[in-house]
Structures are given as structure tokens and as C-alpha cells.
């Protein structure tokens, strides 16, 4: 039987289908503007995989709690919370997505590990040798920085970035792209080098929509791993563990 997972982010819903018989499937969708009915949700899911049956339980992690109301109440759901993540030393306001993705990185690579999630906000998340949350940082993501320049200035244009360009921009668009991309990469390099001074030769995971783009600017650093769907893998891992050990 297929297993459905959903990560509700700030701007998109990230879906995954896991099963024993085939490789996982992943897709993203813009957050819906109105609630799903049961039939609408079934149609939406079966468009991705006709083998999905109605009422297949969905394991969910959300950083936007109010969007949970967009799912039909009578569709089976397992809504994960921070207390469900076996990661100790978490502060109460730690984002659920950060905790799950860091835990999954530790499960895949062992501890200590560093996980960098490059989404709307970029979060840097450290786990120590005992599998505890060891601190981190939050900074505006690529799109958020681009939007702030376009909205907060009179003369600078709106810019979209799909690939890294020349560091030395020859017009406003390329200068903005360079400043944002290389500025973020420089900040991440500083955190990585500091962490590696304490944990040499330990892996660093990049995930999130801009994870691959930013990781490409740091390929001189050893053992950089890009796992776009780290959070969805973590949700599935936790949901399966909760099914086998409901207490």
C-alpha cells in the first residue's frame, strides 16, 4: 500500500508517495486557496498516481498550521508535532520542518551532522554527536532577498534566478543576482567552516528549493550532499515508526 506524506511550507505544499514496490514520487503544488473536498483531494492525488486509493492516510508536517484546515477533516491524517521527533534539546519554537529534516540527515549519515534548508527562509541546523539539536541560524532565502530589493527600492528591478551567474554583474539584474547568490553562499561558507572546525570530515546536507543552486557554489568543500526531499523522507520515517510503536 502506498504511503502519502505532505510538508506544508510557507509558499508551497510538498507531496511524496512512498511504497515498497517502486521508487518514491515527489511533486510540489502551490498552496490551495480554498479547502479540498474529499472527492477533489482524491482526484488530485490519483492524477499523480492512479494506484492511490481514497482515504489513504496522509502523514503531515506543517509550518503553516492554519492551512491544515484546507484538508478534509474526514480524510485519515497523522499530523506530526515537534514532540514526535526524537531529537533532544529542541527549543519550543523550533520549526517542525527543521527538526524533522535534521533528524533525517542524522539517520542517513549518522551524528554529528549539519543540515541547511534553502527555502523561503534559509535555516542552518546543527546536530551534535549525541543526536541533539546543537543550534543554528535563520536568514532570508533567495526569493525573499530578491523581493525585498524590488519592493524596498525605487529603481531596482524584480529579478528571478535559475542558475548562478557571473560574480561581477554588468547591469542591475545581474548585479542583484550576484549579490544575493554569492552573498548567501559566503554566509553559508562561514557557518560551514566554523562547524567543520569542531566536526571535521562530517557531512553537510543541503535541501529545499534552492539547495542545489547554493550547494554548487560550495563544491570545493568536502562531503556536501544535496537531498531535495530530505523533509519528506523524514516525515515518512517518523510516520512508519509511529505506526509500529504508537506509544
Curated annotation (Swiss-Prot):
InterPro entries on file: ATPase_NBD, Type_III_PanK
Keywords (A to Z) from UniProt: ATP-binding, Coenzyme A biosynthesis, Cytoplasm, Kinase, Metal-binding, Nucleotide-binding, Potassium, Transferase
Catalytic activity, reaction form: (R)-pantothenate + ATP = (R)-4'-phosphopantothenate + ADP + H(+)
Binding sites annotated in the UniProt record for substrate: 91, 95-98
Binding locations of K(+): 117
Molecular function terms, GO-annotated: ATP binding; metal ion binding; pantothenate kinase activity
Cofactor detail note: A monovalent cation. Ammonium or potassium.
Active-site residues annotated for this sequence: 97
Subcellular localization(s) per the UniProt record: Cytoplasm
Enzyme Commission numbers on file: 2.7.1.33
Entry's Gene Ontology cellular component terms: cytoplasm
Positions of ATP binding: 7-14, 120
The keyword Transferase is assigned to this record: yes
Gene Ontology biological-process entries: coenzyme A biosynthetic process
Cofactor(s) recorded in Swiss-Prot or TrEMBL: NH4(+); K(+)
Top EC class for this record: transferase
Involved pathway(s): Cofactor biosynthesis; coenzyme A biosynthesis; CoA from (R)-pantothenate: step 1/5
Listed NCBIfam families: baf (TIGR00671), PRK13331.1 (NF009871)
Subunit structure, as described in the record: Homodimer.
Known role: Catalyzes the phosphorylation of pantothenate (Pan), the first step in CoA biosynthesis.
Entry similarity comment: Belongs to the type III pantothenate kinase family.
Stated name of the protein: Type III pantothenate kinase
Organism of provenance: Synechococcus sp. (strain ATCC 27144 / PCC 6301 / SAUG 1402/1)
Amino acid at each position: 500500500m502506498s504511503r502519502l506524506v505532505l510538508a506544508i511550507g510557507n509558499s508551497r505544499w510538498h507531496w511524496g508517495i512512498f511504497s515498497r514496490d517502486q521508487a518514491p514520487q515527489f511533486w510540489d503544488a502551490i498552496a490551495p486557496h480554498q479547502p479540498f473536498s474529499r472527492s477533489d483531494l482524491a482526484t488530485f492525488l490519483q492524477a499523480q498516481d492512479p494506484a492511490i486509493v481514497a482515504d489513504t492516510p496522509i502523514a503531515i508536517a506543517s509550518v503553516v498550521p492554519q492551512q491544515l484546515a484546507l484538508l478534509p477533516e474526514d480524510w485519515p491524517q497523522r499530523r506530526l508535532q515537534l514532540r514526535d521527533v526524537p531529537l533532544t534539546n529542541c527549543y519550543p519554537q523550533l520549526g517542525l520542518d527543521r527538526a524533522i529534516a535534521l533528524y533525517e540527515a542524522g539517520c542517513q549519515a549518522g551524528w554529528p551532522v549539519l543540515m541547511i534548508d534553502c527555502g523561503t527562509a534559509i535555516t542552518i541546523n546543527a546536530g551534535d554527536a549525541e543526536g541533539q539539536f546543537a543550534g543554528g541560524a535563520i536568514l532570508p532565502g533567495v526569493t525573499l532577498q530578491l523581493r525585498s530589493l524590488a519592493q524596498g527600492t525605487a529603481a531596482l528591478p524584480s529579478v528571478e534566478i535559475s542558475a548562478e551567474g557571473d560574480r561581477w554583474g554588468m547591469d542591475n539584474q545581474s548585479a542583484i543576482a550576484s549579490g544575493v547568490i554569492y552573498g548567501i553562499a559566503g554566509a553559508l561558507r562561514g557557518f560551514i567552516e566554523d562547524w567543520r572546525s569542531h566536526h571535521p570530515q562530517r557531512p553537510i546536507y543541503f535541501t529545499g528549493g534552492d539547495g542545489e543552486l547554493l550547494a554548487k557554489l560550495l563544491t570545493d568543500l568536502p562531503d556536501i550532499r544535496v537531498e531535495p526531499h530530505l523533509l519528506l523522507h523524514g516525515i515518512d520515517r517518523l510516520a512508519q515508526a509511529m505506526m509500529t510503536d504508537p506509544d
